[in-house]
Amino acid sequence: MAYWVPMYPETALSHLQALERPRAIVEPVLEGFLVARMEEMAAIDRRAAALVGEILRLLAAGGKRIRPAFCYWGYRAGGGTEDATIAKAAAALELFHTFALIHDDLMDESDRRRGVPSVHVRLAEDHPGPADRAERYGRSGAILIGDLAAVLADELLLASEVPADRLLAALRRYDQMRIEVAAGQFLDVAGVARDEPSALRVAALKTGAYTVEGPLHIGAILAGASLEAMAGLSAYARPLGEAFQLRDDVLDHGEGSAPGATAATVDELLDRADAALDGPHLVPEAVAALRSLGGALRL
């Protein structure tokens, strides 16, 4: 079935609008949910509240909320119309991203995230003991806080008020996404991306899986999207996810810094993603938003 939403012509959404509309529904959900969980942790032990406090600190430091945006527009592309229905799922994906960032900073030994100290660094700074014990405390605490963010993401996704069959299907897709992220992260750590095909494969798993395709699919599933719509979103998401990772490599380290990391490759992937949105199975407003999100990546 083709959808049409006349109040939102395809040219109406800028890149910022495509990000800000989902952000407006996700931020209150995240804050309310995490404040409530911090109070629950404080009831266990006041010191345990700091676990959730660190998650809130990292969220408050910034971030584009790109994964909630793709979840939201996947929902809209699949025919969903009620923002409240998708708000918790979209917020859950930002919590999952927070988990990934905390653990990624540990693996990469990154001292800062979003302009503030990484979680393991912040915890170590607060420890009164010798440097070696402080470092161990920081790393151990960051693992636990990352794990907690993942658990809270599960809880929030499960709270989505949708028919049970859609929620079960979304949870299965969510599990698949998490497995792909773990595989991609491990391959990245193992240093297997030594040629262009390998680099694109790692990018598809590590970045595309949970940045673009996974969130789009979860949103579309919760909307009850058709198989045709799901296929169209996949055809868009896969090259776009690869473009995300390669663009970061070009910006951070220059062209040729990683296999396939060139502006021309990024543009080619973005052209493929854009062309995949030409079918009749997606809501035009969502198509406009997705085109804007992809177009903003051009170098």
Which residues make up each language-model segment?
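All-alpha prenyltransferase/terpene-synthase fold signal
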Residues: 1-299
